[in-house]
Amino acid sequence: MPTIKQLIRNARQLIRNVTKSPTLGGCPQRRGTCTRVYTITPKKPNSALRKVARVRLTSGFEITAYIPGIGHNSQEHSVVLVRGGRVKDLPGVRYHIVRGTLDAVGVKDRQQGRSKYGVKKPK
């Protein structure tokens, strides 16, 4: 426990929380344009070809965003909406593309967990 004299000399420091998605700049989502769409392989125990896109945001930042779901129509110059959220087995991928908005269509034939993949309720 510090003395009052010590606190006067050196005030208590505020603990600042560090954001995990800094390029969004405090916004829940950001719009961006795909500059490259490609696949990468995950970290060690896992094996796959994960679909990712390099996106230039309206704020000027260039980020790598994951394309969730099976099948996608994203290509170069597609306008997409990006949200925060990392992919644990892809180093450097800290963002997700939001399906079902702008140029990213929803996942075809999706029945469960539809809201996460931008799919309307089937009739």
UniProtKB/Swiss-Prot annotation:
<keyword id="KW-0694">RNA-binding</keyword>
<keyword id="KW-0689">Ribosomal protein</keyword>
<dbReference type="GO" id="GO:0015935">
    <property type="term" value="C:small ribosomal subunit"/>
</dbReference>
<dbReference type="Pfam" id="PF00164">
    <property type="entry name" value="Ribosom_S12_S23"/>
</dbReference>
<keyword id="KW-0150">Chloroplast</keyword>
<protein>
    <recommendedName>
        <fullName>Small ribosomal subunit protein uS12cz/uS12cy</fullName>
    </recommendedName>
</protein>
<keyword id="KW-0687">Ribonucleoprotein</keyword>
<comment type="similarity">
    <text>Belongs to the universal ribosomal protein uS12 family.</text>
</comment>
<comment type="subunit">
    <text>Part of the 30S ribosomal subunit.</text>
</comment>
<keyword id="KW-0934">Plastid</keyword>
<comment type="function">
    <text>With S4 and S5 plays an important role in translational accuracy. Located at the interface of the 30S and 50S subunits.</text>
</comment>
<dbReference type="GO" id="GO:0019843">
    <property type="term" value="F:rRNA binding"/>
</dbReference>
<dbReference type="InterPro" id="IPR012340">
    <property type="entry name" value="NA-bd_OB-fold"/>
</dbReference>
<dbReference type="InterPro" id="IPR005679">
    <property type="entry name" value="Ribosomal_uS12_bac"/>
</dbReference>
<dbReference type="GO" id="GO:0009507">
    <property type="term" value="C:chloroplast"/>
</dbReference>
<keyword id="KW-0699">rRNA-binding</keyword>
<dbReference type="GO" id="GO:0006412">
    <property type="term" value="P:translation"/>
</dbReference>
<dbReference type="GO" id="GO:0003735">
    <property type="term" value="F:structural constituent of ribosome"/>
</dbReference>
<dbReference type="InterPro" id="IPR006032">
    <property type="entry name" value="Ribosomal_uS12"/>
</dbReference>
